[in-house]
Amino acid sequence: MAVNVTGADLVILVPMLGRWDRLPRLLHSAFAATPEAQVWLLVSEDDASGRAHLDPARINDGRVVASLVDSRAGTSGDYARKINHGAAHSDRDWIFTGAIDLCFCSDWYAQAARVQHATGALVVGTNNLCNPRTAGTYRGSAHSTHSLFARSYVNERGTADVLGRIYHEGYVHEFVDDEAVRTARYRGVYAHAEHSRVEHLHPACGKEATDPVYRQQGRRIGLGRAEFDRRKHLWGGDG
């Protein structure tokens, strides 16, 4: 399955947790690069502030879709749960696991398409211009924090142990991407598109001011690492 560079086959999933001021930048770059893509904004049902930002004049217009996510699902993984919800309720052939603090470079999807066409990969990684692990080969293997997943892969393979999901919901946030990339690599269906640039405007690389959500990262990393280590036997122990 080859990707369509206009984005007619693409849904970009964006879990929301504040930072609504960054939405115009995200949408502008997404639609400039892929004018026929859909962007799904995934908001927890109990997020009153988030629901208040859903502008009926702009949301659910066919290109931008808002979807409310059950916040009582009983798992710790807010980001993973929202991504999995978006994957389950959308219908485009290719799913991009996004975030509000991204900026899409103009040829990102064309570059990802080139790699997918050449390799037949079902999961294609991108370069976030922030984390050096995403810039190509890093200590023997490339990583991707925000990736393209073929819907067929999600439906037929899923996570390391659950069909129909992109991310394991046992992570608070960090390491969801590590598990997904390593699982796809273990299955032989991952390719890295180092020239597919989706910039992560993150404080860790000096591209954004910190805020309370970012500051929680240090506390969460140890929890994520422990969960990753507990599960890594599922993808051959890589990591």
PLM feature segments, named:
Residues 25-38:
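Short, acidic, metal-binding catalytic loop of nucleotide-sugar glycosyltransferases
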Residues 37-48, 69-72:
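Short beta-strand/loop segment that forms part of the nucleotide-sugar
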Residues 42-55, 102:
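A conserved acidic beta->alpha catalytic loop
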Residues 72-90:
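Glycine-rich, basic loop-to-helix element that forms the pyrophosphate-binding segment
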Residues 92-103:
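Short beta-strand-to-loop acidic/aromatic patch adjacent to the donor-nucleotide binding site
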Residues 107-123:
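Conserved donor-nucleotide/metal-binding helix-loop-beta segment in metal-dependent transferases, i.e.
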Residues 122-141:
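Short beta-strand-to-loop element that shapes/binds the nucleotide-sugar donor at the catalytic cleft/hinge
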Residues 171-239:
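C-terminal catalytic/acceptor-binding lobe
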